[in-house]
UniProtKB/Swiss-Prot annotation:
Keywords (A to Z) from UniProt: GTP-binding, Ligase, Magnesium, Metal-binding, Mitochondrion, Nucleotide-binding, Tricarboxylic acid cycle
PANTHER family: SUCCINATE--COA LIGASE [GDP-FORMING] SUBUNIT BETA, MITOCHONDRIAL, SUCCINYL-COA SYNTHETASE BETA CHAIN
The protein's name: Succinate--CoA ligase [GDP-forming] subunit beta, mitochondrial
Family: Belongs to the succinate/malate CoA ligase beta subunit family. GTP-specific subunit beta subfamily.
A Pfam family hit: Ligase_CoA
Amino acid sequence: EYQSKKIMADHGVTVQRFFVADSANDALEAAQRLKAKEIVLKAQILAGGRGKGVFNSGLKGGVHLTKDPKIVEQLAKQMIGYNLSTKQTPKDGVTVKKVMVAEALNISRETYFAILMDRACNGPVMVGSPQGGVDIEEVAVTSPELIFKEEIDIFEGIKDHQALQMAKNLGFKGPLQQQAADQIKKLYNLFLKIDATQVEVNPFGETPEGQVVCFDAKINFDDNAEFRQKEIFAMDDKSENEPIENEAAKYDLKYIGLDGNIACFVNGAGLAMATCDIISLNGGKPANFLDLGGGVKEAQVYQAFKLLTADPKVEAILVNIFGGIVNCAIIANGITRACRELELKVPLVVRLEGTNVHEAQRILNESGLPIMSANDLEDAAKKAVASVAKK
């Protein structure tokens, strides 16, 4: 949160005054420097639901309001260095290394505003709602008429009349309307300059003093822009990731751990999600989401198996590859090498389709290894689930 607020402030977007602290003493000094009527102290982790989270220090809640800087210090002592568990963190929570000490502003009205890339529109769109501070997905279901969407011409940007109309749709009145429109245009300039794919401000609110403020923001960046956004990508704190995720990233593998016992080894995020779904539909539980991506090499296949077999929860592995860019024969060679060198001890189900699939099937069939081949994804899922059930 503090990173997104700094980025916004650097681009002229109005945010509340704040400092970041990595010790209780620093938090106290920050609170004293703010000289605010009321202070909000927020634990800084890459997860939502902080307000209702619980620390292993015994403290409840990762967001606290107080008027006393000394209380800020006491609370920070129970936050920094302790794990905060929320609905979005692993069971053991995530270690809090920093806290944000900010001026607490009263919000007289909350709205929602976002700019994001929309494939259906082949470009950026503005999305807004006069109902902010709540889950926008819920608003879309219960009150779809309160969701306003406007396409943005990538060559001309947000025009003045578009920004004003969105401000009206969000319910801003009088001088606040122009103020909100100005903030909307600044957010779009930010969106472009930092190569964002999404800038979501919730709440995008107004104060009793007549100020439009971006109170909280979520920003997603285009990974392909890393070469020209080095400063932003350097902010990425990989220490909050599971160690296995960081290890996978070394080999250009995308890994997300899940709670089941059937490991998934797939190319492409969409196919990986579909594989997890079909395992679940057949009564199994996926142990992970592992996306091999395109341009794969045999060494990556070996490393992927090494990661999967290191997970003690894994009782079976399902390989599901649809070879377009990916050469199935390379996958097959990687699989056979991994099985031999790692002495695979769990059932392995393989479904291959696409480029060089016949050569791949020959490699697997002639390997002499106990590999179960599957005709399609449904067949693969059933075999993987059945292999676990036999244990």
